[in-house]
Amino acid sequence: RGQFGPRTKDTVDKANQLLDDFSNMLIKRGIKVDRPTPIDFNQKTSTPDWEAETMFGCMPPRDVLLTVGNEILEATMSYRCRWFEYLCYRPLLKEYYNSDPNMRHESAPKPRLTDADYRKDYLSDKIGIEKRLKWTEDKFFVTTEEEPLFDAADVLRFGKDLVVQHGFTTNLKGIDWLKRHYKDHRVHAVNFPGDPYPIHIDATFTPIKEGLIINNPQRRL
């Protein structure tokens, strides 16, 4: 569903300019900036279970990598087009691991992402918005509970509390896996009705400081 294939050069140039400007702003503030190593995303990828015509990209490391303490965890990812996205960050993770004896590089079990992981025709255009909103309110999402699935961008950390959004890209088995993995943290599953396509908690709310968050009004708390 949706667009795939190369973006236009104009949009790529604009996006790169935005990223470069943001990087330069951080560097001027004394912050070290590392950038991922892109691969050719405009190529067909496959596993023994499926094929995808193209891949996604590597603009948001927040989607793939979850940092908690001295550990960086590679998420399972729930889109087939993002299955190999972790490769863009491996050079940096290798560098961090070699330079810091306390750094832990972990990877969640890679899912097979067979057809059993998705509800057939869930994204059909024939389904109206009211039905979709009812589905999300009932926690009935496009992904099933076939195997643990989660994107790192579905997790927000508040001290020892990890708040995890249950939605399109993270299922309950994925949340349970996180609970077992982060035994020193409290993991809370949350759901935000009001968005028919709930993906990623960082598009739901963002903590600013103690006692203050910014909330997406379409995903009411």
Language model features with spans:
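The feature marks the mature, well-folded catalytic cores of soluble enzymes
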Residues: 1-221
